[in-house]
Amino acid sequence: MANKLTQPKGSISKETNKEAIARLFGIKKTAVGYISTSVLIDPYTILYDESTETCWYRGTATGTPISWIITNGSLTLQTTSGQFALIKTQVDINLRQEITGEVGYSNIGKVSSVTSLRSIEPTTNGQQIILNQINSTLGTTTGGIFCYDSSDVTSIDDGYTVIVTATGKRWKRPENYIDMAWFGALNPAVDFSDAWDAAVAIVSNYVSNVGFYGRKAIYLKAGTYKPSRQLDIPSYVSVVAIGNVTIDGSGMPDNSYVIRIINKVSGISTTYHKGWNLGSIGGTFRVLGNTLDGNVDGIFVGNTSNMSDVRNVILYGVSIGGVRYGLTFGSINTYLFTATDCHIESTIIGIYVPNTTSSNSGERMTFNDCTIGGSRTNHIQISQPGFDVNFTNCSFDFTSGNVFYGTSTWGYSKVSFTSCHMEGYNGLLLSAESPQSSSVGSNRSIIMNNITNLSRLRSNTTGTNSSSRLHIDAKSTPVYINGLDQRHEVTPYLEDCLMCSDETILYINGYIKDPYFQLPSNTMILNKGYNMGDEVVGTVVNSTATLDALTRYTCVDRNAMSATVITGGTAGTQLQVTGAGGYFNLATKSFIPVTVKNRLGLYLSLSALDSTGNIQCTFSVAWYDVNDNLISTSSASSINMRTVFNDTTLPNYSDGNSRYIATPSRTFNAPVGAVKCKPRWQVSGFTGNINVSRMVSFILAG
């Protein structure tokens, strides 16, 4: 039995066996027959004995078999016409060894092309056949197994996945996905753009003619692919990278997107699409352009005309880089977008939403666990009205411009950041142009929750990670911050320590973990006259009798020092303090209301002028109850501003002692029972003159 031809059992397999035997002998299937007591053997050349799984030459034997026996490699056959001795075929002797050997699979025959496959009529449901290639142009990577589906009488012959014979029978690929290799994607002689378009067309046509459910995803094997032109995909088609896939768009024409997710037909419901439009399994779906200075953009999502809604688009594990605009959004019927675990880097603008004709767009655009880095101009730039975007657990790393930038046409919109990390921007954290109209400005807002901001410049210039640096200039735009880890690492080197511009409407709560606290907004300053503007020029504080001579402040104590209110020209009204190593201590005349939830911040700004010695600055707060009784006094360690003026690493060191520099802020928590307070500012230790231009108390958080 060692030389038997092993074949599957059952009636369904008989025709398949005949086909296989016919190919081995180079004869027609009709020349192969089974030895059976009910079948006339005269029409056949090769006889197959099913019980021993062996093949025999019929020779001159005729008639219908009655009985047969195999002895010593010979078959004695008794038929209605007599007794005959049949010779065993040589192929039968060698076949088992060839098929079960290491290269046995290569001995199985294949259909040469789709054209040939159309001429082969299947006979049994589930019958399989191997196609060598779609055609010689696309190559052998396009081949594969096809199965006969007798239940299908409607599928269209698409030339790749469904092949229809002359009698209407359908050979179909059994896979539950579409492999872009079937369209020539792995053949370097084939334009990848053609392979992409052909694969996408099959799925798109299925959705158009049959419906979304039942449509297959397109798989793209690991490798690098170089399309010659823009790749388009409807929002209801999925392309999934298996492993690391790179779409190299460096050879594309100017003003192309490497990939556009766009609908070109109307009337297709995209309501229930929830699959990845672009995604990756076990790797990254990488999209490359022709460098930042080229004119090729990354991915476009949206409609440019009134077509089927581009909704529920999902990007997963997609990386975009080396392009002008990383991810661009359209503005017609484009909404409910999600990007997860994606990366956008080395762009002019990372996420770009231009101002075009807008209709039914911008609802719940979401980014989760994404990184946007290396943007030359801005990480995010929005001009389109009505674009609501949410960033959660995202990182924004290094840009020569702003993290977020809203133009004058941006409005009717909310942008939110939750648990995000910002680092290394040369411009601003948040920037917005003045709105085109008051209605636009009043309908836009920015919300930030649990944010970490390491604000050093992309160029990492010394001093730029300082609390002197403005971070927010969102003109007429409310900014709500709840939880900010602002990591300034450099002392102030300018007169003011403002987080936002005067034109920004800022609400902040939970400002934490910063050794150099900023004044969030001028609206949070508690003491009127913080810039000495209310004081009378010429007022002298130099004796016990005149300790209370200032308008807004009381000199509560002094030693070997006196002060005079002077005019500083463009620098404004100032308090010039003259000392000989003593101290000078001012407090507000009026009480400042507080609650136990308040954290009070204090700083002062000064110019060192001709002074020598240490310039010690100390802050304290006297807390009072509802009946004006002193509860306690909180003090902070002193700050030697001489070391700041002598710091050669600060950007404005060359301006010398004429600079006005703010002290680092000191903060105090109101004790239980406190309902009001009087902040105190003290300077001491120097000889000569200094000018004080700011004495600020502010609510840091509430």
Curated annotation (Swiss-Prot):
The domain of life is Viruses
Q: Its Gene Ontology biological processes?
A: adhesion receptor-mediated virion attachment to host cell; symbiont entry into host cell via disruption of host cell envelope; symbiont entry into host cell via disruption of host cell glycocalyx
Q: Which UniProt keywords apply?
A: Degradation of host capsule during virus entry, Degradation of host cell envelope components during virus entry, Host-virus interaction, Viral attachment to host adhesion receptor, Viral attachment to host cell, Viral tail protein, Virion, Virus entry into host cell
The principal localisation class reads virion
Compartments reported by the entry: Virion
Cited InterPro entries: Pectin_lyase_fold/virulence
The Gene Ontology CC terms held by the record are:
virus tail
Report the protein's function. Functions as a receptor binding protein (RBP) and probably mediates the attachment to the host capsular exopolysaccharides. Displays a depolymerase activity that specifically degrades the K11-type polysaccharides of Klebsiella pneumoniae capsule.
User: What's the protein called, per UniProt?
Assistant: Depolymerase, capsule K11-specific
